[in-house]
C-alpha cells in the first residue's frame, strides 16, 4: 500500500447493509461536486486491511461495526452523511475534528459542565462532540451553554450572572435522539423545558416561620425543583431558612455546615430566576444584647451586668427591650400576672431567661398536663435547675396541677407530708420575675391548703432567702454553709475532688458539691433521691455548677446557653459557693475562686458531643495548656490533623495556629498554588493507621501525636519529632493523659493562678487525684529528712519521677467535708510503701545469697525434674535467678542491638509500630523503607517466597532476613540471639530451640563484666562442651553441677539440664556423621573428634564447631528435639553400630543420583549452598533450614533406602555399634529415645508395608496447596512432611507436583493448570484420612468431583461443582490415554499458541497452557501465523504503547483467534464450547468465509492423531 503522505485525498463512503437513507443522499450529493477519482464507495473489508491513518474522509453510517472501530482506532477522519448534507446546504467546511462527527445538530455550540458525576459528564462530552459541538473543561467567554446537575457551584453563579443558558443533561440526550431521526439544529428543541430548576439539588428546611409561610416555602420549593424536609438531616439538608439566629436547628446547621440563610434568599432566587449566592443572605449569630444601661453609678470591675432580658409572657410579638428601673419593673410585672388562657400553649420558652438555679431545691411533680404543654413545662423545670419526678413520692415538694386528678387527691389524703399544690401561674411568674414567688397565693382551688411539715423546712428557708433579696437572686446559699464557704477560700486550687457519682453515695451528691452534714433533716430528704423507684430526669450537667471565666461576651453567652440546654448551672464570679467546674479558654486564665476542677471549653464541647461527663484528666486538652507567649516555633510547618473530631480537632487546629503552623485539610506531598494547597510537613494523629498515616510513611514525613504540639507550646521551641512519633506510643500509654507533667519553664504564662502559686508548690498539678502514697504530702520534718536521705534528691524529685503514671482517683472527701467544727478529725495514712522505702537497701554482695531450708530443697528438686522433663523454653530456665538479676544490673538494654538497623516488611505492617518500638528499646534503629543502611529485614513467609519485596532484599548480600520472633527473643532474653535460629520461615508452633544455652553462654561471656559471673559461666560452658561428645559420666555431671554445695540449687538445675543436652548433642552428632557419610564433599579436618578434645573451651570455639558442622544437622534440631527422652541414662548413648564401608559408598551414590534437576523445591537450592560452604564459611543467617526442607531432605535420603534396603536397616537397628565409627542410621534406638507422645509424626520408613504396588511405593508424592487458610497450610504441610511427602511452596502451579489439595474449587491458575495436566485434585479430607491412617491412602474417594465429596459438600455453587467434575473427568481421561497409549498428554496437547494479553497476566496464561501440553510461542509476529493453531488476545487490557497482533491477518491464515475466556471454558465444560462464541471481532469475517481455521489447518497436519482431534471436537 502506498504511503499515507503520498496518497491522494478522497472521500470514501463505507458501504454496509445497515446504511440509512441519508447515506445515499450524501453520496448522490457528493457525486455532483466530486470527481470519480476522489469519490469512492468501499466495503468494510477494505477498511479492515488499513494499517495506518491516511488523508481520506470516511463517511460511515451507522457509527458501529468492526470497520468503524478499526478506523476510529487508527485516528482516521470520520463523519456521518448528515454532516455532508448539512455542510453542502449551508456552504460550510466539513469539521476537521479529532473524533468522529455524526451530525451537525450542535454546531456553533460550546458547552461546559458543572456538578455532574464522572459517567454523566463523559456521556455529555461524547454526545456534544459527535453532534459537532465543542467542549471546554473550564468556563470561559467562549462557552455558550452550561450543563449543570444541580445549582450552587461557582460555574453556575458566574454563568447565571452572565445570563448564559443553564441546562440539564437531558437536553443533550434529547438532541441526540431527535437528530437521529432527521436533520435538526439545537434551536429546534425548546430549551425552556430543559432549563435547570432554581432549587435543583437543594434540600431546604425552615425554622422560626409561621405555618402559612412554611406551606408556601414547601410549595414553591417543589415547584422549582428542590426538596423540602421538615426535619434537619445531617448530610442531606443543604439550606436552613431561619428567622433568627437561635434554636436547636440553627446550632446543628452551623455544626453540620448547612447554609443558614434568611427567607429573602428564597424569594430573591425565584424572582431573579436562578439560585442566589448564599453568602449574601447568611444569618450570623447575634451579639449579646445589653440589658442594663450605662450609668454613672460605680458597679465594680469584676461584677457582670445582669444578663436577664425581661419579656412578657403574652403573645405580643414586639417586646420592648428598653431597660427600666428594677423596682418599677417589679410593679409593672405584678400588674400583668394573669396570662391569657392559651398562654402555656403559645409560650416561647426562649423568652424566659431566669437564673439557672431558680428552682434549686424544688422537687416538682407535674399533674394533668399533656402534649406540648408538658414538654414546655419539662424544659422550664430543667432550665431552672429543678428536679422533676415522674411519679408521686414523699420527696416531692411542689405539685403543679393542670387538670384535676382523682389519684392526686387520694395521694394527698394518704400522705403525711403534703407538698405545695400549685397552679402553673406560680412557675410562669417565678420565671418572669427572676425569683421564686410565694406559694401561698398560687394554691390550687381544688385541693385543700395545708402547711408544709418539718422535713421541708430547709426548702421553705431557701425560698424565704430568695424572696428576701430580689436584687441579687443568685445569692441564696444556706446560712449554715457560710463557715464552709469561708474555709474553702483558703484551700488550694484544684485540690477539690470530683465526687463519686455511684448510686451508693448519692446521698452526698447534692445539687451543689457542698453537703450539710449536720443538717439531718436535709440529708433525710435527700436520701430519698436514691430510691430506685423514683425516676429523676435531668440533663447532661444536671446538679453541676459552673463558673465561666476568661471569655469574650459572645463566647461566654454561647457557653452559658450550652449549659442551660444540658441542665447545668452557671454561678457568678462573686458567688462564694464552690463551683464544680471553672470553664476557661484553652490557654487558661486566672481563677481566683475555689473550684472543683478547672476545665477548658474543649472539655465542654467533647462532653456535649459524646453525651457523657468526661474525666477532666483523660485528655490533655481538657485542662489549660501551658503556652509560651509570643513564640511561633512552627511558622514554617504545614500541619494536617487526622483522626480527631469535633472540639478536640478544633482545639488542636487553634493551638497549631497559635504556634505559627499552617493547618490544611488535605494531606499532599507537593504544593498546588492554584488550589491553595501547601506541601505537608507534619501529620498529627491518634493511632498508627489510616490512609494519611500510610502516605506519611511513604513520603518519610513525621506522624506525631498531639503531645508534640503540647510540647512545642510548653517550651516555645520546635520539639524533636522522633520522641513523639505515633509508632513509638505503647498501647497502654495511648489513653494516658499528658497533663500530669510538672516541668514548667518560668517564662511560660501559667494557665491557672491560685492563692498558693505553682512556682512555690510544683506538686500542685499532680494533686488532681490523691494517690495511695504521695511523698509530697508528708510535710513533717522527720518524714522529709528520712525521705531526702533515702533518695538524696530534692523534695520534689519524688513527685516528678512518677507524674507520668497517673493513678485513678480515690474519690476522697475535701476538707470542706470532713473538717466539721463539732467532729473530731482522725486522719489515717497508707504508709506501707513509705516504710518499705525506709528498709536497708541490699548490698552488692547480697544478690547471690539464698537461704537454705527444707522447703527450698524440695522446691529445688522439683524444679530440676520439671526442667529435665521439659522440651520447651530451655533458654528461660538455664540461667539462674541470680544471673538474671545480675544481667539486669550490669547490662544496658538500650545497647543490646546497637549498630542494628531493621526494616519491617509490608506484610507485617499491622505490627510495624510494635516491632519498631521493641527495636528502639533495645538500641536498634529502624527504617520505614528499605535502604542501604538496613542490616536486618523483618519478614514472614515461605522458603521460596515469590514476593518482589523478598526477592529484592534477598539479592542484597549481608542482609539478615529474620522473623519477627527474633526481636521478641532478643527482648525476652535480654541479649542478641543468633539470627540463624529465627529465619523468616520460623514458626514458634513447629520449631523447638535446643541451642539457646550455648548462645546464652556466648552472650554472657561477651557482655559480662563481673568476675564471679565469668567464672560461673566458664564452668558452665566447660561442662556443656564436654557433654557435646558424650565424655562425661554421671559422677562428673554431679561434680560439675555443684556437688557438696546444697545451698545453690541452681547448679543442680544446670547439672540435670546438662544431662539432657548431652543426650541431644550425641544424637545430633550421630546424625551429622550420617549426613557427612552421604555427602559428596571432601572430609573436613575441623569436624573430627580429635580436633575438639584439646580445643580451648571458649564461646568462640563453641561457635566455630557449629559453623563447621553440616547445615542439615542445624536444621534437623527442630524436628528431632522431641524424640529425646530426658530421663535416659547418659551411658545409653554409647551405641555400638557396625560400619559397612560398601553400604556407605552406595548411600553416597544414591544421594548423588537423587538430585532432582527439574524440581523447584528448597532442598536442591539449599544443598547447593551447603556444598559451596563446605569450608564452614557461611553466615549465621544460613544456619537453619525450614521444616519443608527437612522433609524434602529426608525424602531424598531415607525413602529410597527404606524401599530398597529394608533388611539392612533392620540389621543396623539391632546390631551393636562402636562409638568411634558411627554408621549413619535413620533414627536412634528406641531404648535410648522412646517416643511417648512425639509432636512430630514418625517417618514413613518406620511404618508397616503400604498396600500400594512397588511402583506406587517408590513414587514420590509432591503436593501443592490452594485455597486454604494460613493455619491449615501450616498444619497440612507438616502432616505431608511427616508422612514422607514433599510440599511445594509456590504461588503458581508447579508441573512437578502430583497432587493438589484444594479448599474450594476456584477458577484460578493452580486449579485449572492441575486440571489440564491431569493431576489429583483432592479435598482436604484426604489429608485428614491420611492423618488417621498414618500413611498415604488411595485417592479416588477424596477427589473433587467424586460422588462421595460432592454429596458431603453441599455449600458449593454450580460453577464450583462444574470445576470439581471437570477435574476428575480430565484426570481420568489423561490417565487413560497414558495407560492405553503410553503417551503423557495434557488437555492442550497439539495446541500451538500465540498470546497477546496483559504482560502481568501473560506468565499465568503461559504456565496454564504449558501445563496442558500446549506450545506457546514467544512473541506474535506474522511468520508465526503459519505454524500457530490458536491466538488468544485481549486488547482491552493492553496499554496504548504495547504492540498488538494483527488479528485479521492471523485469521486469514486459519488461526483460531479467540478470547482468553475460551481456555477455562474448554477445560470446565464436558463438550468443547463453540469457537464462534469466543471469536475476536476482527476475525469474525474470516470465520464466516473460511469456516473454522483449526479444522482446515489440522487436516493438513500429519503430526496430530485422531485421538487428539476427537478431544478437541
Swiss-Prot record:
> Which top-level group of life is the source organism from?
Eukaryota
InterPro entries in the record, alphabetically? BRCT_dom, BRCT_dom_sf, BRCT_TopBP1_rpt8, Secretoglobin_sf, TopBP1-like_BRCT0, TopBP1_BRCT_1
Chain segments carrying region Disordered: 289-308, 786-809, 1031-1053, 1086-1109
Q: Where is the signal peptide?
A: none
Keyword entries, A-Z: Cell cycle, Chromosome, Cytoplasm, Cytoskeleton, DNA damage, DNA repair, DNA replication, DNA-binding, Nucleus, Phosphoprotein, Repeat
Q: Where is the composition biased (Polar residues)?
A: 786-799
Q: Where in the cell is it found?
A: Nucleus; Chromosome; Cytoplasm, Cytoskeleton, Microtubule organizing center, Centrosome; Cytoplasm, Cytoskeleton, Spindle pole
Q: Where is this motif: Nuclear localization signal?
A: 844-850, 1508-1511
Please give a single GO biological process term from the UniProt record: DNA replication initiation
Which positions does the record annotate as the modified residue Phosphoserine? 1131
State the protein's purpose.
Scaffold protein that acts as a key protein-protein adapter in DNA replication and DNA repair. Composed of multiple BRCT domains, which specifically recognize and bind phosphorylated proteins, bringing proteins together into functional combinations. Required for DNA replication initiation but not for the formation of pre-replicative complexes or the elongation stages. Necessary for the loading of replication factors onto chromatin, including gmnc, cdc45, DNA polymerases and components of the GINS complex such as ginsl/sld5.
Please describe the quaternary structure of this protein.
Interacts with cdc45. Interacts (via BRCT domains) with ticrr; interaction is cdk2-dependent. Interacts with atr in the presence of atrip. Interacts with recql4 (via N-terminus). Interacts with gmnc. Interacts with cip2a; forming the CIP2A-TOPBP1 complex.
Q: What name does the UniProt record give this protein? A: DNA topoisomerase 2-binding protein 1-B
Which organism was this protein described from? Xenopus laevis
Upper lineage: Eukaryota, Metazoa, Chordata, Craniata, Vertebrata
Amino acid at each position: 500500500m502506498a504511503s499515507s503522505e503520498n496518497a491522494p485525498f478522497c472521500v470514501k463512503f463505507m458501504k454496509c447493509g445497515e446504511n440509512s437513507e441519508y447515506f445515499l443522499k450524501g453520496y448522490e450529493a457528493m457525486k455532483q461536486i466530486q470527481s470519480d477519482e476522489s469519490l469512492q464507495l468501499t466495503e468494510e473489508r477494505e477498511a479492515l486491511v488499513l494499517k495506518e491513518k491516511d488523508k481520506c474522509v470516511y463517511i460511515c453510517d451507522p457509527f458501529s461495526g468492526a470497520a468503524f472501530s478499526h478506523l476510529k482506532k487508527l485516528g482516521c477522519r470520520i463523519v456521518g452523511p448528515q454532516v455532508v448534507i448539512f455542510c453542502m446546504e449551508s456552504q460550510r467546511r466539513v469539521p476537521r475534528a479529532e473524533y468522529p462527527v455524526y451530525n451537525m445538530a450542535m454546531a456553533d455550540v460550546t458547552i461546559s459542565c458543572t456538578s455532574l458525576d464522572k459517567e454523566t459528564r463523559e456521556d455529555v462530552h461524547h454526545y456534544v462532540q459527535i453532534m459537532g459541538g465543542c467542549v471546554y473543561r473550564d468556563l470561559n467567554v467562549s462557552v455558550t451553554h452550561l450543563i449543570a446537575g444541580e445549582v450552587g457551584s461557582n460555574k453556575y453563579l458566574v454563568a447565571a450572572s452572565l445570563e448564559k443558558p443553564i441546562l440539564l443533561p437531558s437536553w443533550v440526550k434529547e438532541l441526540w435522539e431527535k437528530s437521529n431521526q432527521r436533520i435538526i439544529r439545537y434551536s429546534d428543541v425548546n430549551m425552556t423545558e430543559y432549563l435547570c430548576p432554581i432549587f435543583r439539588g437543594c434540600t431546604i428546611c425552615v425554622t422560626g416561620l409561621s405555618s402559612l409561610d412554611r406551606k408556601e416555602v414547601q410549595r414553591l420549593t417543589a415547584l422549582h425543583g428542590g426538596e423540602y424536609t421538615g426535619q434537619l438531616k445531617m448530610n442531606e439538608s443543604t439550606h436552613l431558612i431561619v428567622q433568627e439566629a437561635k434554636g436547636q436547628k440553627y446550632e446543628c446547621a452551623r455544626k453540620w455546615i448547612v447554609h443558614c440563610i434568611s427567607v429573602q434568599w428564597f424569594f430573591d432566587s425565584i424572582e431573579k430566576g436562578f439560585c442566589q449566592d448564599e453568602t449574601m443572605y447568611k444569618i450570623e449569630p447575634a451579639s449579646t444584647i445589653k440589658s442594663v444601661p450605662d450609668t454613672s453609678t460605680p458597679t465594680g470591675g469584676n461584677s457582670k451586668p445582669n444578663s436577664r432580658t425581661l419579656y412578657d409572657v403574652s403573645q405580643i410579638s414586639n417586646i420592648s427591650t428598653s431597660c427600666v428601673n428594677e423596682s418599677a419593673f417589679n410593679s409593672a410585672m405584678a400588674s400583668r400576672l394573669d396570662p391569657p388562657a392559651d398562654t402555656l400553649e403559645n409560650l416561647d420558652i426562649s423568652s424566659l431567661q431566669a437564673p439557672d438555679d431558680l428552682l434549686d431545691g424544688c422537687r416538682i411533680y407535674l399533674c394533668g398536663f399533656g402534649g406540648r404543654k408538658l414538654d414546655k413545662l419539662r424544659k422550664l423545670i430543667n432550665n431552672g435547675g429543678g428536679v422533676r419526678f415522674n411519679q408521686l413520692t414523699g420527696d416531692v415538694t411542689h405539685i403543679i396541677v393542670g387538670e384535676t386528678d382523682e389519684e392526686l387527691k387520694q395521694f394527698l389524703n394518704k400522705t403525711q407530708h403534703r407538698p405545695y399544690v400549685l397552679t402553673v401561674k406560680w412557675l410562669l411568674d417565678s420565671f418572669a420575675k427572676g425569683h421564686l414567688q410565694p406559694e401561698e397565693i398560687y394554691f390550687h382551688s381544688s385541693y385543700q391548703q395545708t402547711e408544709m411539715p418539718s422535713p421541708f423546712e430547709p426548702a421553705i428557708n431557701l425560698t424565704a432567702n430568695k424572696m428576701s433579696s430580689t436584687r441579687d437572686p443568685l445569692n441564696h446559699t444556706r446560712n449554715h454553709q457560710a463557715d464552709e464557704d469561708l474555709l474553702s477560700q483558703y484551700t488550694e486550687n484544684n485540690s477539690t475532688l470530683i465526687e463519686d457519682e455511684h448510686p451508693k453515695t448519692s446521698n452526698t451528691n447534692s445539687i451543689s458539691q457542698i453537703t450539710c452534714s449536720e443538717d439531718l433533716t436535709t440529708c433525710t430528704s435527700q436520701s430519698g433521691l436514691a430510691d430506685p423507684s423514683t425516676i429523676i430526669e435531668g440533663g447532661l450537667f444536671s446538679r453541676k455548677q459552673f463558673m465561666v471565666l476568661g471569655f469574650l461576651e459572645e463566647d461566654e453567652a454561647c457557653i452559658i446557653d450550652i449549659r442551660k440546654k444540658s441542665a447545668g448551672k452557671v454561678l457568678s464570679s462573686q458567688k462564694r459557693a464552690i463551683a464544680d467546674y471553672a470553664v476557661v479558654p484553652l490557654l487558661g486564665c486566672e481563677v481566683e475562686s475555689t473550684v472543683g476542677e478547672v476545665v477548658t471549653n474543649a472539655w465542654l464541647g467533647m462532653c456535649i458531643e459524646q453525651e457523657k461527663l468526661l474525666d477532666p484528666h483523660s485528655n490533655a486538652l481538657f485542662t489549660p495548656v501551658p503556652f509560651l507567649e509570643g513564640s511561633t516555633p512552627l511558622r514554617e510547618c504545614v500541619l494536617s490533623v487526622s483522626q480527631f473530631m469535633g472540639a478536640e480537632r478544633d482545639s488542636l487546629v487553634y493551638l497549631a495556629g497559635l504556634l505559627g503552623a499552617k493547618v490544611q485539610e488535605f494531606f499532599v506531598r507537593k504544593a498546588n498554588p492554584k488550589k491553595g494547597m501547601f506541601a505537608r510537613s507534619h501529620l498529627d494523629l491518634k493511632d498508627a493507621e489510616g490512609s494519611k498515616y500510610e502516605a506519611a510513611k511513604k513520603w518519610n514525613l513525621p506522624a506525631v501525636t498531639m503531645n508534640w504540639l503540647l510540647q512545642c507550646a510548653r517550651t516555645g521551641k520546635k520539639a524533636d519529632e522522633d520522641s513523639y512519633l505515633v509508632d513509638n506510643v505503647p498501647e497502654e500509654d495511648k489513653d494516658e493523659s499528658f497533663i500530669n507533667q510538672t516541668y514548667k519553664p518560668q517564662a511560660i504564662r501559667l494557665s491557672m493562678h491560685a492563692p498558693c502559686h505553682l512556682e512555690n508548690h510544683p506538686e500542685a498539678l499532680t494533686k488532681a487525684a490523691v494517690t495511695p502514697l504521695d511523698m509530697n504530702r508528708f510535710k513533717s520534718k522527720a518524714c522529709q529528712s528520712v525521705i531526702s536521705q533515702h533518695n538524696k534528691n530534692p523534695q520534689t524529685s519524688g513527685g516528678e519521677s512518677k507524674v507520668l503514671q497517673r493513678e485513678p482517683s480515690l474519690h476522697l472527701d475535701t476538707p470542706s467535708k470532713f473538717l466539721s467544727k463539732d467532729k473530731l478529725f482522725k486522719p489515717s495514712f497508707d504508709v506501707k510503701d513509705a516504710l518499705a522505702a525506709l528498709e536497708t537497701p541490699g548490698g552488692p554482695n547480697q544478690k547471690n545469697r539464698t537461704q537454705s531450708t527444707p522447703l527450698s530443697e524440695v522446691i529445688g528438686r522439683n524444679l530440676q525434674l520439671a526442667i529435665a522433663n521439659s522440651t520447651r523454653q530451655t533458654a528461660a530456665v538455664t540461667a539462674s535467678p541470680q544471673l538474671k538479676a545480675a544481667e539486669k544490673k550490669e547490662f544496658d538494654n538500650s545497647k543490646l542491638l546497637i549498630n542494628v538497623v531493621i526494616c519491617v516488611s509490608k506484610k507485617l505492617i499491622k505490627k510495624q509500630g510494635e516491632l519498631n518500638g521493641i527495636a528502639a528499646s533495645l538500641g536498634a534503629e529502624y527504617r520505614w523503607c528499605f535502604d542501604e543502611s538496613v542490616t536486618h529485614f523483618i519478614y514472614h513467609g515461605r522458603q521460596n517466597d515469590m514476593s518482589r519485596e523478598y526477592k529484592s532484599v534477598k539479592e542484597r548480600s549481608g542482609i539478615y532476613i529474620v522473623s519477627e520472633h527474633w526481636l521478641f527473643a532478643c527482648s525476652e532474653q535480654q541479649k542478641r540471639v543468633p539470627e540463624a535460629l529465627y529465619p523468616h520461615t520460623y514458626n514458634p508452633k513447629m520449631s523447638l530451640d535446643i541451642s539457646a544455652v550455648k548462645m546464652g553462654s556466648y552472650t554472657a561471656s561477651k557482655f559480662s563484666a563481673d568476675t564471679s559471673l565469668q567464672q560461673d559461666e566458664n564452668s558452665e560452658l566447660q561442662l556443656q562442651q564436654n557433654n557435646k561428645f558424650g565424655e562425661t559420666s554421671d559422677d562428673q555431671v554431679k561434680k560439675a553441677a555443684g556437688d557438696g554445695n546444697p545451698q545453690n540449687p541452681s547448679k543442680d538445675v544446670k547439672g540435670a539440664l546438662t544431662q539432657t543436652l548431652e543426650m541431644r548433642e550425641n544424637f545430633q552428632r550421630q546424625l551429622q556423621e550420617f549426613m557427612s557419610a552421604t555427602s559428596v564433599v571432601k572430609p573436613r579436618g575441623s569436624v573430627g573428634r580429635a580436633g575438639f578434645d584439646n580445643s580451648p573451651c571458649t564461646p568462640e570455639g563453641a561457635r566455630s564447631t557449629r559453623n563447621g558442622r553440616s547445615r542439615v544437622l542445624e536444621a534437623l534440631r527442630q524436628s528431632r528435639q522431641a524424640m529425646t527422652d530426658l530421663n535416659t541414662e547418659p551411658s545409653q548413648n554409647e551405641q555400638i553400630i557396625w560400619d559397612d564401608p560398601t553400604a556407605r559408598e552406595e548411600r553416597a551414590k544414591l544421594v548423588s543420583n537423587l538430585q532432582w534437576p527439574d524440581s523447584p523445591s528448597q532442598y536442591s537450592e539449599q544443598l547447593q549452598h551447603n556444598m559451596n560452604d563446605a569450608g564452614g564459611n557461611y553466615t549465621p543467617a544460613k544456619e537453619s533450614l525450614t521444616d519443608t526442607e527437612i522433609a524434602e531432605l529426608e525424602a531424598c535420603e531415607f525413602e529410597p533406602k527404606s524401599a530398597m534396603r529394608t533388611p539392612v536397616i533392620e540389621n543396623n537397628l539391632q546390631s551393636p555399634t562402636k562409638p568411634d565409627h558411627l554408621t549413619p542410621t535413620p533414627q536412634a534406638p528406641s531404648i535410648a529415645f522412646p517416643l511417648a507422645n512425639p509432636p512430630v509424626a514418625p517417618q514413613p520408613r518406620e511404618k508397616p508395608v503400604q498396600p500400594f504396588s512397588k511402583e506406587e511405593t517408590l513414587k514420590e508424592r509432591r503436593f501443592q496447596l490452594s485455597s486454604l487458610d494460613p493455619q491449615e497450610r501450616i498444619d497440612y504441610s507438616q502432616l505431608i512432611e511427616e508422612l514422607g511427602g514433599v510440599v511445594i511452596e509456590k504461588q503458581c502451579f508447579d508441573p512437578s507436583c502430583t497432587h493438589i489439595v484444594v479448599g474450594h474449587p476456584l477458577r484460578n491458575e493452580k486449579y485449572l493448570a492441575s486440571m489440564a495436566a491431569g493431576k489429583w485434585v483432592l479435598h482436604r479430607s484426604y489429608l485428614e484420612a491420611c492423618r488417621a491412617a498414618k500413611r498415604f491412602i488411595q485417592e479416588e474417594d477424596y477427589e473433587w468431583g467424586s460422588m462421595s465429596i460432592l454429596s458431603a459438600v453441599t455449600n458449593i455453587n454450580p460453577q464450583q461443582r462444574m470445576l470439581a467434575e471437570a477435574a476428575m473427568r480430565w484426570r481420568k481421561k489423561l490417565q487413560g490415554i497414558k495407560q492405553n497409549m503410553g503417551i503423557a498428554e495434557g488437555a492442550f496437547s497439539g495446541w500451538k499458541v500465540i498470546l497477546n494479553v496483559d504482560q502481568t497476566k501473560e506468565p499465568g496464561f503461559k504456565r496454564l497452557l504449558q501445563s496442558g501440553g500446549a506450545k506457546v510461542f514467544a512473541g506474535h509476529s506474522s511468520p508465526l501465523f503459519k505454524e500457530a493453531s490458536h491466538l488468544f488476545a485481549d486488547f482491552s487490557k493492553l496499554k496504548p504503547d504495547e504492540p498488538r497482533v494483527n488479528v485479521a491477518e492471523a485469521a486469514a491464515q486459519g488461526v483460531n483467534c479467540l478470547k482468553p475466556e475460551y481456555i477455562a471454558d474448554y477445560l470446565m465444560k464436558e463438550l468443547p464450547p463453540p469457537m464462534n462464541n469466543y471469536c475476536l471481532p476482527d476475525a469474525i469475517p474470516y470465520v464466516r468465509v473460511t469456516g473454522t481455521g483449526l479444522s482446515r489447518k489440522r487436516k493438513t497436519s500429519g503430526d496430530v492423531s485422531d485421538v487428539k482431534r476427537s478431544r478437541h471436537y
